[in-house]
Amino acid sequence: MISENNLLPLNDTEHFLKNFLKKFPVYQTKIINPLANEQDYIYLLHLLEAEWHKQLPDQTFFLTGSSGHLSEDFFIPENQNVCILKNLRYMPLLMHSHQFIEINYVLKSNHSLLIDAEKSTPLQDGDIILCPPNLQHTFQTQNKNSIIVDFILRVTTFDTVFFHLLNNNNYLSTLFSNVIYGDSNGYIIWHCQNDSALKELVLKVYEEWENNLKYCDKMIELLVMEFILILMRSHEDEAVFSTSYINNSDENFRSLLNYMQMHYQTVTLSKLALAFNYSERQIIRIFKKNTGKGFSELLTEIRMNKAIQLLKNKDIPINGIASMLGYSSTYYFIKVEQSYV
């Protein structure tokens, strides 16, 4: 099996980018956000392309077809569901979002940073980041010894292949659902420095992608599924949500939230209070303290996150979905679903 040292050599694009930053050092630290200043973004792209054609005239410009919001097809080959990449080192700090789901594994950090709209987060060896669609972010990896491996997943693939893994009704399932399907505009990060199983899986996935053997796409899906399962089983308590209330939640809140995930069809405030021997007022205070939201709003979020998936199955009638989610009235479910969207 390949080792992390096999991933250290710079490729042609990284050599180009390293030279570019030497020639234009302002872009070593300047963050370019197309949403804030489109002219700066366009200027940098033109500058990169001009320098590329000078240095690599026989190669297609590596950002051809790119934009500030990257489509799934920019990276993922047609008829495939997952793409495995090595994050480009020496890339200028171009803020971007994307249509797909991205899972990053930090093999070697060497002072790498994850930059989003709010802050810069130092990364450590073994860190795992779940970047959802539409999150504005970039990575600062201006070091030849930095290695970050990217899993790029189509959203439809995550829905059909991976989402059933998250129906375990636990705290981490809630995190995944909020990040990917909610409006949190945040990411999840795990610090998993000592998990050799995850590291070996990442290297195995990368090797499978590079070798491109028969059925490699299906093998990669299975390996990524195993990766997510280990993450959920072994590192639930290490998940940090970048911007959400969940980051600062207490154990009482986690227990209440888990219970609601398990019993979302039938749970009421009075039943929740009885199950935990709290008064209804105590539960309301816990929810307000940790989320700023009430019981009904949280329950609606849980139900609507599940509704998003059920509505994609055309074989289930609307009244059936309403019943599965705990709504006795199909009309009321439709009203709630439309207002939530």
Residue ranges, per PLM feature:
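Short, Lys/Arg-enriched, Trp-marked, Pro/Gly-tolerant hinge/linker segments that flank
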Residues: 189-192, 210-220, 229-262, 271, ...
